[in-house]
């Protein structure tokens, strides 16, 4: 039994993308794949990471889609059994300790989790006094979320009940962080980007400051739970490990 488990894990190809726009320390394990996001906009900047502008991509949309340009690249170009997304400042992990780099999810831990659960997520982020909808309304342009809801109601009505329920909550699985089977990620990306591209056609970006322009990374944060719950996938929560100090006043929030 032990040898069979080891054998099956050996052939479980997991790639966890680490979205980054600048040079920074990276995990040493080959389960992690650093991805330079927005490479198309900075062709002379070579971080030595996988660029997000190879093959079919939306790299030039990074100012609006943030880390989603990495997951789009993986959806269209990466061959793996499981894929995940973390950030150069935020990782997933299961251990506690002073050295955060020693607490990051290992390949073996990721393999064990993926064998038992459909999707791996960071622990819920709680807002306590605000719902997800009201928090967005108070920090961003709520018309963007209203347009998203209208598109879901028209094109994906089976997702509307979960959308309405999720928006009432004071918590959610944020930061677009996950690990899931590639076939699930393919389903998710096809659904997610179809919605976001339709919202994009209804937005005038000319007057939006850079911080507010990153709206698709924020909208997608709220849609992940909608997709998971509508499809009935199981999930396992593990720790989110923050590298450095989070800038709370700005946590409206700025994506990579």
Where are these regions (language model features)?
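Short, Lys/Arg-enriched N-terminal segments with co-localized hydrophobic residues
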Residues: 1-11
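ER/Golgi luminal nucleotide-sugar-dependent glycosyltransferases, focusing on the catalytic module
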Residues: 11-253
């Amino acid at each position: 039994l032990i040898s069979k488990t080891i054998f099956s894990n050996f052939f479980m190809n997991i790639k966890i993308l680490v979205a980054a726009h600048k040079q920074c320390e990276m995990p040493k394990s080959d389960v992690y794949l650093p991805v330079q996001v927005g490479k198309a906009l900075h062709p002379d900047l070579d971080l030595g990471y996988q660029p997000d502008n190879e093959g079919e991509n939306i790299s030039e949309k990074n100012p609006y889609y943030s880390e989603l340009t990495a997951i789009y690249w993986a959806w269209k170009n990466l061959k793996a059994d499981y894929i995940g997304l973390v950030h150069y400042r935020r990782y997933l992990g299961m251990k506690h300790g002073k050295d955060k780099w020693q607490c990051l999810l290992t390949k073996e831990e990721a393999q064990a989790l993926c064998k038992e659960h459909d999707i791996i997520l960071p622990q819920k982020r709680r807002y306590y006094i605000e719902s997800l909808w009201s928090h967005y309304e108070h920090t961003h342009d709520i018309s963007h979320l209203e347009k998203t809801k209208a598109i879901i109601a028209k094109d994906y009505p089976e997702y509307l009940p979960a959308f309405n329920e999720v928006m009432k909550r004071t918590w959610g699985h944020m930061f677009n962080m996950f690990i899931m089977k590639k076939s699930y990620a393919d389903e998710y990306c096809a659904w997610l980007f179809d919605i976001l591209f339709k919202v994009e056609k209804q937005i005038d970006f000319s007057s939006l400051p850079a911080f507010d322009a990153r709206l698709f990374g924020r909208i997608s944060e709220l849609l992940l739970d909608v997709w998971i719950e509508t499809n009935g996938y199981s999930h396992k929560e593990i720790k989110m490990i923050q590298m450095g100090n989070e800038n709370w006043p700005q946590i409206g929030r700025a994506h990579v």
